[in-house]
A protein has these predicted regions:
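A domain-start/cap signature at the N-terminus of enzymes
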Residues: 2-5, 9, 13, 34-69, ...
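Active-site machinery of serine-nucleophile hydrolases
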Residues: 69, 76-117
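Hydrophobic h-region of N-terminal signal peptides that target proteins for export
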Residues: 27-35
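Short beta-strand/loop motif that positions the catalytic acidic residue
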Residues: 189-191, 195
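Gly/Ser-rich "nucleophile elbow"/oxyanion-hole loop immediately N-terminal to the catalytic nucleophile
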Residues: 64-65, 112-144
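The conserved beta1-alpha1 loop
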Residues: 73-74, 191
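C-terminal catalytic histidine-bearing segment of alpha/beta-hydrolase fold enzymes
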Residues: 196-251
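Primarily recognizes the serine-hydrolase "nucleophile elbow" in alpha/beta-hydrolase
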Residues: 137-181
Length: 251
C-alpha cells in the first residue's frame, strides 16, 4: 500500500499565493456591485440643426395686396440638384388655370432621401415672412413621394394650411395613429385606380381612418389612371378654385 499523498510546502505556498492574487478581484466585484446606481432623469436641451434646401419660388410682380401661396412637393423622380425639373407634373404646368395671382413654392428634395418635412415647414415660414404672403391662404399639395410629404407635414402642422391635397400618396401607420391631427383640415385625396406603383389601398385605408374624424374630407379615384393621376388632378381648374376659396380663419 502506497504512502498517503501529501502536499509539499511549495504547493501549499503556491495555493496561498493564488488566493492572495485573486482576492482583490473578488473584493473589486463586490465593491462594484455595492456602488452601482440607477439614474432616472430627462434630457431637455435646445439643439440647433442646420437645414439646407433648394427651391423655386414663382412670385407675381406688382401686387399691392398679400397673395396666396401654393406649396408643391415633387415626387422621387425630381430629387437631386436640377431645380428646373421640380416644375414637372405640377401646378407650374397649369398656371393658366389659376384665376388670381398666386405664389408657387417648389422646394427640391436632395438625392437618395425622402422629404424632410421640418425643413419644408421652416422654409414656408421664411417665405411667408420675407414676401407678401397671405398667411391665411397657404395651400399644400404634392404627388407620390411628395404626396407622402404633404400628408406628413399637414399632420405635423395642420395650423399652417388652409387646404391640402395629396396625389397618389403612400401612407403609413404613423399617419393613421395620429389621424386626429387632420380632423379640422380641408383635405382632398386623389389616386389612380390602376396605380401599380403606390397601390390605391394607400388612399382607401387612410380615407377610412380620416373620414370618421373629418367628414368633409374627400377621396377621388380616377379609375383609368395609373401612377400618373397627377395629370388628372392638376389639370382640373376646380382644384385651384376649391383651394383658393378657403382661408384658415374661415374653415
Amino acid at each position: 500500500m502506497g504512502k498517503p499523498f501529501r502536499k509539499t510546502k511549495f504547493e501549499k505556498r503556491n495555493k496561498m499565493n493564488l488566493k492572495q492574487k485573486f482576492l482583490p478581484f473578488l473584493f473589486l466585484g463586490i465593491t462594484s456591485l455595492a456602488t452601482a446606481q440607477e439614474i432616472k432623469s430627462e434630457f431637455n436641451k435646445e439643439v440647433k440643426v442646420q437645414k439646407k434646401m433648394s427651391y423655386i419660388l414663382d412670385m407675381p410682380q406688382n401686387t399691392k395686396s398679400k397673395i396666396p401661396l401654393i406649396v408643391f412637393l415633387h415626387g422621387s423622380g425630381e430629387r437631386g440638384n436640377d431645380l428646373e425639373i421640380v416644375k414637372n407634373h405640377s401646378p407650374f404646368t397649369y398656371k393658366n388655370l389659376i384665376k388670381e395671382p398666386v405664389a408657387i413654392l417648389a422646394p427640391q428634395c436632395p438625392a437618395n432621401t425622402w422629404w424632410d418635412t421640418e425643413a419644408v415647414y421652416f422654409l414656408i415660414k421664411e417665405i411667408s415672412e420675407k414676401y407678401k404672403i397671405d398667411k391665411d391662404r397657404i395651400y399644400l399639395t404634392g404627388l407620390s413621394m411628395g404626396g407622402w410629404g404633404t400628408l406628413k407635414l399637414a399632420g405635423e402642422h395642420p395650423e399652417m394650411f388652409a387646404a391640402v391635397s395629396a396625389v397618389c400618396a403612400p401612407t403609413d401607420r404613423a399617419m393613421w395613429a395620429n389621424i386626429h391631427n387632420y380632423k379640422d383640415l380641408n383635405i382632398k385625396l386623389f389616386h389612380g385606380g390602376m396605380d401599380d406603383i403606390v397601390l390605391p389601398e394607400n388612399a382607401f385605408n387612410f380615407y377610412q381612418k380620416l373620414h370618421p374624424v373629418n367628414p368633409k374630407a374627400e377621396l377621388t379615384i380616377f379609375p383609368n389612371d395609373n401612377h400618373n393621376s397627377w395629370d388628372s388632378t392638376y389639370s382640373d381648374p376646380k382644384l385651384y378654385e376649391w383651394m383658393l376659396s378657403l382661408k384658415k380663419s374661415k374653415n
